[in-house]
Structures are given as structure tokens and as C-alpha cells.
């Protein structure tokens, strides 16, 4: 009776059971296929977001003057990216007028470069960061978007300084075995190679040519054509810390007490800009800022590009002279803070960089 009742009550029971069994057979492949499709879409989107557009060979990431002074400030399209000394050197951004100050990273940065939609810099969290990732020290050459997102390590090695040149970052790579050598890595990390075994400072660059001084047999001015990575002699002088600006190479004259000179790439002439002994300098569009080395009257100085009208910016010893379109930033030697600034052109007015303290 129960069997007869069940068979008549549910005459399609065996059919339904068969359909259910069939569904069980295809539902797993459908789920697996859906998950695979989602993974493919995620990877495609991630690849698109991580894509680094090509740069023209003329693109450079920062000025030689800024990079020779630590690369603590870099500017592009009205935005300034800087290593905030008031917050352990962490990466910040702001407008050129020092408004809209924003923290971008949780680690100390230097040698800041900007090109296109990306930032390139040396990052080191040895001074302390936040979160589990900072339990172990990490350092290296990094790339991120302009807002600090999508952080990517291009080379987990120590870097002395670096310069963006077109689609490559040229950098002085250092370790205790090989010491300092010049490497380059493509901005999308697809290529990395040794450029030279010698110590080459890549900071001074124009239109794909890196200008650097010799460090082994002489202190001549050399050019490195990044299109072929070939080296040639530009000027047989005795110079240090070359900086390119408007067809001139500004440099410290080693043979004459480190006075500041400039060499014309147009007519191959040399001009003496000051007889002061110079510790460091930076060249802007209107003025040269330099630290005068003097036992009696050390001072941060500025003068016009041809060496005329020298004037004192601040008495004492200063370092880390970085220039933006609005201000010249610097700090006292041996002291990270306070950071001072003065308008990069116009009347001198030295005040603390208070916007960075907020």
C-alpha cells in the first residue's frame, strides 16, 4: 500500500531524481568555469591598471640639482611630491603653493622622480613604518601612482641615486660585494641590466643624454647616450656634480677650490660664476642657490645664472637645497628639522616650512 501510494502520488519521482542527478553533474563545471572567468577578468583589469605607458626619450624625473641634494622634492603639473622631514621622510604631495598637503606612503623616501602618471623613488622603512609589513626591513627602488597607490618594487637593492630617462630608470645600485655600479630597469620592470661597472651619477640628464663627471682616471665631463648606452667625452675639465640647465653644464671646479663654473654646450666656453668654495648647489630658472664654505662667514647664497648679484639667503651651514617653481627648501647641516624655505625668485624671505608639520 505505501509503495502503491508513493508511485501514484509522485509518478515523476524517478524522472525528477534523474534531472537532479544531471544538474549535479553540470553545476560543478559551471561554477568552476565562472570562477575561472572571474579570475581572467581580474587579471585583465589588474594588468590594465598596472600598465605603464611609454615615455618620450626627453622625459626626465627630476632636476640634477634636486637629485644631487637628496631628491627630496620633485614637481610636475602643479603638484609637488616631497619627503617630509617632519614625518620621518615619508612621501607626501601638495600643490606648489603648499596647500592640500597629503601623505602618500608609510616609509621614508628619497631620490623622488615623477614621469607621466607614476612616481619613482628609493624607499626604506628602516626608520619605522606601520603595519605587519614593517616588522622586517624592506628597501629598494619603487614605482607608484601619483597618489601613492599600486606600489611596485622594481629592484630590491640599495640605490644611491636614480633618474628617470624615458622608459628606463637609471640608478646607482650598491651592495657590499659589487659596491656601486650603474644599472637601468624598465619602468614596467620587464628589463633590467648593468650599464657600467664604473661609478656614474645619472642625475644630470637632457633629451636622453646623461652628463656625468669621471671618477677613476680623471674628472672630465662625459655624456652617456641612453639610446645606445655609449659614453663619449664632452669636456676635458676637472669637475664635480654637473647639473644641466638650458644648454649649460653647471659644476664645481675641483682644480680651483671647488668654485662654481658653467660650461656652454653650444660654444664650448667656460665661465667662472663665483670664487667662493662651494659645498653644494642647485640651479633654478632664475637663480643659483649654493652653500658657501667659509670658516669665518659660511652662508647659503644665491646669485643670478651668470653669477651676478650674489646675496646671502641665510647665514650658517645648510644642506639639502631643493627647488620647486615656488620655493627653495633647505635645512641646517646636521639637522633634519626645521625645514626652511624662501620664495625661489623675488625678495628673500626665509620662514619655516610649517605646512609640512600639520
Model-predicted segments: where are they?
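A short beta-strand motif characteristic of beta-propeller blades
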Residues: 55-64, 99-105, 149-155, 190-196, ...
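N-terminal Sec-pathway targeting helices
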Residues: 19-37
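Blade-level signature of beta-propeller repeat domains, shared across WD40, Kelch, NHL, RCC1
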Residues: 317-358
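Beta-strand-rich domains and repeat architectures in extracellular enzymes and scaffolds
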Residues: 58-90, 106-111
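Repeated scaffold domains used in trafficking and secretory/extracellular systems
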Residues: 67-74, 107-116, 156-166, 197-207, ...
Amino acid at each position: 500500500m505505501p509503495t502503491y501510494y508513493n508511485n501514484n502520488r509522485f509518478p515523476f519521482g524517478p524522472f525528477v531524481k534523474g534531472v537532479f542527478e544531471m544538474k549535479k553533474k553540470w553545476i560543478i563545471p559551471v561554477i568552476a568555469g565562472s570562477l575561472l572567468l572571474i579570475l581572467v577578468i581580474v587579471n585583465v583589469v589588474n594588468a590594465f591598471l598596472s600598465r605603464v605607458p611609454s615615455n618620450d626619450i626627453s622625459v626626465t624625473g627630476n632636476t640634477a640639482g634636486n637629485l644631487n641634494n637628496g631628491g627630496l622634492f620633485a614637481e610636475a603639473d602643479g603638484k609637488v611630491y616631497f619627503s617630509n622631514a617632519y614625518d620621518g621622510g615619508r612621501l607626501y604631495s601638495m600643490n606648489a603653493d603648499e596647500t592640500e598637503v597629503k601623505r602618500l606612503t608609510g616609509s621614508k623616501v628619497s631620490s623622488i622622480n615623477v614621469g607621466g602618471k607614476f612616481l619613482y623613488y628609493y624607499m626604506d622603512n628602516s626608520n619605522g613604518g606601520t603595519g605587519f609589513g614593517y616588522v622586517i626591513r624592506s628597501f629598494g627602488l619603487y614605482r607608484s601612482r601619483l597618489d601613492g597607490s599600486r606600489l611596485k618594487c622594481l629592484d630590491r637593492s640599495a640605490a644611491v641615486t636614480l633618474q628617470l630617462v624615458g622608459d628606463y630608470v637609471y640608478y646607482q645600485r650598491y651592495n657590499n660585494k659589487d659596491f656601486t655600479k650603474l644599472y637601468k630597469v624598465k619602468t614596467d620592470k620587464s628589463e633590467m641590466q648593468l650599464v657600467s661597472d664604473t661609478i656614474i651619477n645619472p642625475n644630470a640628464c637632457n633629451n636622453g643624454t646623461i652628463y656625468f663627471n669621471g671618477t677613476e682616471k680623471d674628472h672630465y665631463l662625459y655624456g652617456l647616450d641612453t639610446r645606445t648606452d655609449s659614453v663619449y667625452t664632452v669636456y676635458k675639465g676637472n669637475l664635480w656634480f654637473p647639473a644641466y640647465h638650458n644648454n649649460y653644464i653647471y659644476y664645481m671646479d675641483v682644480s680651483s677650490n671647488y668654485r662654481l663654473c658653467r660650461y656652454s654646450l653650444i660654444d664650448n666656453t667656460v665661465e667662472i660664476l663665483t670664487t667662493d668654495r662651494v659645498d653644494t648647489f642647485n640651479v633654478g630658472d632664475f637663480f643659483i642657490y649654493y652653500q658657501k664654505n667659509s670658516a669665518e662667514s659660511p652662508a647659503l647664497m644665491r646669485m643670478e645664472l651668470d653669477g651676478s648679484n650674489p646675496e646671502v639667503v641665510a647665514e650658517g651651514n645648510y644642506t639639502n637645497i631643493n627647488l620647486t617653481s615656488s620655493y627653495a627648501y633647505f635645512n641646517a647641516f646636521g639637522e633634519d628639522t626645521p625645514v626652511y624655505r624662501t620664495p625661489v625668485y623675488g625678495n628673500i624671505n626665509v620662514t619655516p616650512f610649517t605646512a609640512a608639520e600639520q
